[in-house]
Structure formats: C-alpha cells, structure tokens
Design a protein with these regions (language model features):
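C-terminal catalytic histidine-bearing segment of alpha/beta-hydrolase fold enzymes
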Residues: 166, 182-223
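Serine-hydrolase catalytic machinery in alpha/beta-hydrolase-like enzymes
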Residues: 2-114
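Short beta-strand/loop motif that positions the catalytic acidic residue
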Residues: 167-169, 173
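Alpha/beta-hydrolase fold active-site loops
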Residues: 21, 163-164
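Short helix-capping segments at alpha-helix termini
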Residues: 43-49, 109-110, 134-137, 190-193, ...
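Primarily recognizes the serine-hydrolase "nucleophile elbow" in alpha/beta-hydrolase
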Residues: 106, 113-160
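Short alpha-helix in the alpha/beta-hydrolase fold that links the catalytic acid
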Residues: 36-41, 177-187
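Alpha/beta-hydrolase-fold catalytic nucleophile elbow
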Residues: 57, 118, 144-145, 168, ...
Length: 223
C-alpha cells in the first residue's frame, strides 16, 4: 500500500464537472503545502475547467546549510554555492513520492497529459527531476525561483520532449541567484525543449503580475 504525502487539496470547479485536470505544486524549503493555497483563486482560471490542485507537505529533515535544523525539506542542501551541493538520494526519494501523487491522479481519472508539475525554489528542483524524467506525456512543467539540481542524474524522457516548460525568476533573488534560472533555461533550450522564461523585479518570492501570467499559461496548456 502506497504511503502518500499529506497534501492540501484545492479544487477549481465552478461548473461542478468531474475533475479532469490536476496541478501538483511543491513548496520551498521550510514552508508547507499551505504556502500557495491562496494563489488558486487569484489565477483567473477558466470557469470551464475542473482542476484539482495538490500542494504536498515536504517531509521534515535536517538541513545542513541551516545548521542541521530540522524543517520541511524535499532534500538536504549541503552547500549554498552556485553549484548547490545537495543530497541527490533525497531528491530522488522525494521525486518518487511526487510520482506516486501523479499515479494517484491518473487512477482517479486524470489523464497524464492533463497533469502539471510545478514547484517553487527547492520544490522546483524536485519538479524538474519528476517531470523531465516522467515516462508519460505531461501537460507541463512550471518552475519558480529555482535551479536544475540533477541534470546529470535525470533520465530525460522522450515522452516529454515537447512538454511546455515555464521558468520564472526574480531579477534580484538573494537566495537562488537569477543566473541559476538562466542556466536551467539555456540548458533545456539547448536540448530542444519548449521553454518560456520570464523575470520579475522581485526577490525570492512571487508577485501579482506573475500569478496572473501563471494563470494565463495554465489556461492555455490545460484547455
């Protein structure tokens, strides 16, 4: 029996139809699944869509760069250099837990091509690992204020070679420097992926114009 991550569930379904779209959205280090819950009604999603948002809670673990403090974390960060030394085994374990959530959505009747994987900061690094290696075509990948931590260990799936990817970053992010977002965008573009890249005049956060843009993107790829 699969032990699923606890998650906050928000459904956008004005027409009261059967849910047939899903967005699995991962929070950042030290946060929780409640972090992006308030964003859903601000996205301006089409009333014709029936979308389930799944905001999982990360497991609690010691984080080396925070003095070994135990907090919600998708993986341990060993060093905050531009290379971002991380515990790869933990990011792979977290990725498996997210893939379990994807499979649960499929079992509930949501086709994989109608499932978006999204993440902010540390959650975005896991989202990259999950979506780029997923064996079935997904609706899209959205990564916010993050970095591609596991390029060398991802088994890139041909099923998602044409998957829309949205990368967004703050221009003066002091936590995840914008160069890391740019590197991810360039690497994936060079591999032939369909990447849309936006920056905003902000730090390590999200802003209202960005939320509106995310909503437009979701309306487009989930239509």
């Amino acid at each position: 029996m699969t032990d699923y991550l606890d998650a906050v569930i928000v459904e956008h379904n004005p027409s009261q139809k059967k849910i047939d779209r899903a967005v699995i959205w991962l929070h950042g280090l030290g946060a929780s699944g409640h972090d992006f819950e308030p964003v859903v009604p601000q996205l301006g999603l089409s009333d014709d869509m029936a979308v389930r948002f799944i905001f999982p809670h990360a497991p609690k673990r010691a984080v080396t760069v925070n003095g070994g403090m135990v907090m919600p974390a998708w993986y341990d960060i060993l060093e905050m250099s531009l290379e971002r030394k991380i515990d790869v085994a933990q990011i792979e374990a977290s990725s498996k837990q997210i893939k379990d959530l994807v499979r649960r959505e499929i079992e509930q009747g949501v086709a994989p091509e109608h499932i978006v994987i999204a993440g902010f900061s540390q959650g975005g690094a896991v989202a990259y690992h999950v979506a780029l290696g997923y064996p079935e075509r997904l609706a899209g990948l959205m990564t916010l204020s993050t970095y591609l931590a596991t390029n060398d260990s991802i088994d890139y799936s041909t099923a998602n070679k044409d998957m829309p990817i949205l990368i967004e970053h703050g221009s003066h992010d002091p936590v995840v420097p914008i160069i890391l977002g740019e590197q991810a965008k360039q690497l994936l573009s060079d591999k032939g992926y369909d990447v849309t890249y936006h920056t905003y005049p902000m730090a390590h956060q999200v802003c209202m114009p960005q939320i509106q843009n995310i909503g437009q993107w979701l309306n487009s790829i989930l239509a």
